[in-house]
Amino acid sequence: MSSRDGLHWKRWGEAFLRPGPEPERWVNRNNMIAWGMLVTKSALPGAPDEISLYSSEGYYQKDCRMRRFTLRMDGFVSIHADAAGGEMVTRPLRFDGRELVINFSTSAAGSIRVEVQDETGNAIEGFSLDDCPEIYGDEVDRTVQWKQGSTLEEVGGKPVRLRFVMKDADLYSIRFR
């Protein structure tokens, strides 16, 4: 589920956690998520924190146990583009802050570029796709850069659209700081 306002929710029909190959996980009350989620340290040195979820496994068995699943921060839902590519354009929005920060993941051949547009959809000078070098990798806190740098001060507080052009990539979240 996800919500843009905390009041209205969208639920997807696809499984979030699949039962896996063990037959015992396909029956009543298995894969039931335990109450709450935790922010935990990654097992990889230097990697960002992650979200841990726990679910029941083998509920009716003598050796009933909890299984830990991990997600990247804000990794519940993403805008996805396959290798053929895709685009997403936001509705006009106003923001406070000086920089755009994205949480994303690409393949080695994938990328994301960001264009800042006026409210009618025209690229703002200095913030076009041509001004944004390809972004690739796997980060939860990457500041978007354009040729002139990362500052968005000149468009802050004004209605703008953000255009994301993506290839073999997932965009999990955006924020301004």
Show where each model-derived region lies.
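Carbohydrate-active catalytic/glycan-binding domains of CAZyme proteins
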Residues: M1-R177
